[in-house]
Each structure stands twice: as C-alpha cells, then as structure tokens.
Amino acid sequence: MFDSVDEFIGGLGNPTGTACYLPYHSCGEDYLHNYIGMLGIPLEPYPELNSAHNNIFIAKNAAFDKDIVLKIKELLLSGKNVIITTGLLKAIQDNGFDTITNVRCTDRKAYVNKFAVSDYGIIFNKIAVSEKPVLIPQLEYSTNDSWQLVSGLGSENNFPILIKCSYGKGSLHILTIPDDFGDLYYYPAEALYPIRAAFSHNSNILIDTVSKISLFTYDNGSFIIKSFLPFPQEVTVTVNKSKVSLVDIVSGEQIKGLQCGNKTIFRVQIAPMSYRVYKEI
C-alpha cells in the first residue's frame, strides 16, 4: 500500500476541506465526522474555532464550549457558512440559540424512505427513494425564516433533512442526523448532493454520487476519490473553473470535461475498493 502511495504523494498539496470545530476534551455525536467523510465531504478538524475559514461544521461536541452560541452568531454576522447538526441544535436551542433561528429539534421521530430535494427551498423538484427507512428526529420551524433544501417525506407531511437559514451576512445550515449514524449512508445520491454543496459552499471541487465514496482535496488543485464500495461506481466531478482538464497523477492520463457555464464537469469510473488521484491542469 505504501509503495502505491509513494507514486503520487509528492504531487499533493496541503489538505483542505470544511473546517470542523472539535474542542479539547469534548464529546457528543462521537465518530460522526467519520460518517460525514464517507459521504464524499472532505473535513479538516481543528480544536479551536477559527474565523479564517469560510465553511465551518459544528457537531454536538461543541456544546462543551459555553460560548458556542455567541461564536456561531459572530461567524454568521461576518458572512460565514456554518453547518450544525440536529444533535448540537437540541443541546443549545434553550441557551440563546433562538436569537439566531427559531428552528427547534423535538423529541418526536419519523421514519422516512422518500426524499424531496429543492434547489432554493421554494418547491421540490426531485424525489428519491432510499433502500430502507431511516429514523430521524423531527424539527419544528417557521417557513418564512427557514428553507428546506432536502426533506424526508411522510404521510401527507414532510420533515427537514437539510434546512437553511439566513442570519446577518452568513448562512446557517442544519443537517438532520439519523438515530443510527450509519443510516446516513442510506440518504440517496439526490439528497447527498445538496448536503455536499452546503458543506463545500464556493469550494473548488464537488462530487455527485452515492455514499461510501470519500473525497480528499488539496490546495494545489489535486484531489483523491476513494471508493469503499464492493462494485464499480461512476462519480461526477464538478470543478468550479472553466476550460480545465484533469490529469491522473498515477497514470498520466488526461481527461476532458464538459463545459457548463463557469464550471467543468467530469465523469469518472472508480473500481471497487480503489481510488483515483487527479490534478487540475
């Protein structure tokens, strides 16, 4: 394994990804970040909250920080994109978080296996079905303040999976975490794409595929796609630049993409349990 890594490690830059706030000596939603990473979302953990990052993911363990509500408010006022979990929401919603948004996490649950996706939170334009029902917490929210980007569908009802709120110059996204973290893998690809987009707002690389495909990004335009699936899988890669190509760092193969406005879109095949290493050129 190490011999194969030696073939490309020198061509990688410094790792990038959505900043994760993991305070020292904290716990809560333990190991959730591992599951999020398996959804194709690159993460970079930090023990302190750094306002230099534009995208910041905060899970329940951050409730150990007694100033977390104030810190989130300051991040949003400065124009940052903050993503929190339903676990953190429930832990801090009675500690002043209602001054930021009126979304609340209740004790009620819902089983969902149908998902609806909205581009802007106004109408649902995609419906997808998961392989099994997923048990999620139910959120309460006011429609004039919050917008559902992904929703789980019930019987004549719907439940937020990804909800967006605006505050100051920034955006707050709340991600619904199933009772069983492993059920995140059953969120269908159509639901995972807007979740990845929320974590990677204005980032250079975004993938569209099923779960158990991980993405590792670097500051020199290189990235790794790693599959943990037992079968081949197509991955759509969007590079937020026009007129770029990809080169496979290991094989030297060049890949041409499809121009779509100021973006370039590539479709690549990943073999079972394997990886591909690319760089923009």
Regions found by a protein language model. Give the residues of each.
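A conserved amphipathic helix/loop scaffold
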Residues: 60-281
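Aromatic side chains
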Residues: 21, 53, 275-278
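Short boundary motifs at domain starts and secondary-structure transition points
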Residues: 5-17, 47-49, 163-164, 214-216
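Short, surface-exposed connector motifs at secondary-structure boundaries
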Residues: 17, 53-54, 81
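A short, well-structured beta->alpha microelement
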Residues: 33-54, 60-63
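Hydrophobic targeting/anchoring helices
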Residues: 1-42, 174-176, 182-185
